[in-house]
Amino acid sequence: MRRLLTSSLPAAYFAYSHRVAAFSNNLPPLTAVRRLTMTSTSEDLVDVDCNLLHNDLISMMDISSLDFDDIQAPLKILHHPSTRSIKAVISPSSSIEESEQTLSLLQNCTSRERNHMRIKTTVGVHPYSSEEEALTPENLDKLRSMLNDSNNNEIISCIGETGLDYSEGFPDKQYQLKWFKSQLDLAFEFGLPIFLHERLAFEDTLKCIDEAVERHEGQASPKIIVHCYTGTFLECIEYMNRGYYLSVSGFILKKGDDADEVRKCLREGIIPLERLMIETDAPYMGFAGNKDSFFEAEGDSFASLPSKKRKRLKSQYPNTPSSLQLVLEATCNQLNIGLNERCEEMISLDQLAASTTQAATDFFRL
């Protein structure tokens, strides 16, 4: 996740919004979510997007009183007590350099350093890097070299993070389109799933995918996960009709119409549970209270910090993997609002945890 601009809601939404307002008041209060944390799930969770190499995430461990000096810096956060419910992590790459760095990290770390978690990465170029990382034969060969290296077979899960993002501040779409099309071809070439980033570019994204399918007629189409979904209800329906997977993040704990579109997708039950996953997108996609369990685990160490520093650290950014439990609970809340309205059997936190973990295990070959 890089940047996000709001988009308008379809007119049909407002009738729906009026109907559910009395029940959900647009956003379930965070206090209601926190009540669920008193009995957290007994199931293991998978964070399908945690940017372990991001400096702002790594720096969160600078305040920790816990001794992890013998652990490589990007992996220290996985040893924090607040991540104890996580069993596996996908740490996606956004550039050729980051792809190389993450592969090197994961090839050379021990199971103990990983805190016995299963960690995989992706190989690719993010839309944000599409101009800086020029599409040249040499750069494509670098990606192919990583993908052909047998030492990476158990580490690389997908091609990506790739896609299109027409938000303000992103490179011109001419750069994005070239890289996206080339990476779609790589997915067909190597038989790997696609880790898709799409913001405000729904139609062009589908057009590129459809054209790739035509170019590779007769080949099996790669599986696709639309990560950190922030699109509309109608767009989600189309993604689901195509059989894509989808992950939700702390975006559903934010206020606003855009976030309610995603909550509506959950309430209306249009995402099959076997294709629904959860993520933090840390250090991005923070929300109010997202680091509470992190600070609680630090105890007196955090309390002893100067008040200004505590206040700054309690801001929504940077997000940490510790918020995954809250994302799970908020997802469960929204699903159950819809199930209750339809007089259907509601889903427990453990059931949803098991379902999202199974979906991630199947998709990423964990």
Predicted regions and their residues:
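Mid-domain alpha/beta scaffold segments of enzyme catalytic cores
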Residues: 4-5, 9, 16, 23-366
